[in-house]
Swiss-Prot record:
GO terms for biological process: protein folding; protein tetramerization; protein transport. Keywords: Chaperone, Cytoplasm, Protein transport, Translocation, Transport. One of its GO terms (cellular component) is cytoplasm. It comes from the Bacteria. Disulfide bonds: none annotated. The gene is secB. This is Protein-export protein SecB. InterPro entries: SecB, SecB-like_sf. HAMAP family: SecB (MF_00821).
């Protein structure tokens, strides 16, 4: 009897498993080489992030973290590095809100070190000085995203009423 109750508790308990982490796409461009190597190196580096998720089957999701790193030396683009790091995750027993947080913050947090290492490797292979991307607070980014959606949803009825 206790064994049956134990099994039911395990089925209801939240479960999170990483099935696979992989590189979905990557690109490294040096549009102004070799001239860029002959100039004094004083880059301005810009990082753009994006995440998306797809439901593959019951309780199985693909999450893709996209990083675009652009380094400009003066007005010229020194390099452009684009990486899509993806993972397949099995997630069970979460509320809709918890699932959204897992897909929008926790999974990207798992993927980021892999993407950061890949970007660093590509930049090094391009013979540029080492690039270490700072950690990203995906929880804060997700909270900001949720606030923006809530604000947009609150404004939408007001706009509809004004148009009526």
């Amino acid at each position: 009897m206790a064994e049956v109750a134990n099994n039911e508790q395990q089925e209801q308990a939240p479960q999170f498993n990483i099935q696979r982490i992989y590189t979905k796409d990557l690109s490294f461009e040096t549009p102004n080489s070799p001239a860029v190597f002959q100039k004094e190196w004083n880059p301005e580096v810009k990082l753009d992030l994006d995440t998306r998720s797809n439901k593959l089957s019951d309780d199985v999701y693909e999450v893709v973290l996209s990083l675009t790193v652009t380094a400009k030396n003066g007005e010229e683009t020194a390099f452009l590095c684009e990486v899509q790091q993806a993972g397949i995750f099995s997630i069970q027993g979460l509320t809709e809100q918890q699932l959204a947080h897992s897909l929008g913050a926790y999974c990207p947090n798992v993927l980021f070190p892999y993407a950061r290492e890949l970007v660093g490797s590509l930049v090094g292979r391009g013979t540029f000085p080492q690039l270490n991307l700072a950690p990203v607070n995906f929880d804060a980014l997700f909270a900001q995203y949720v606030q923006q959606r809530q604000a947009a949803a609150a404004e939408a009825p007001a706009v509809e009423e004004a148009n009526a």
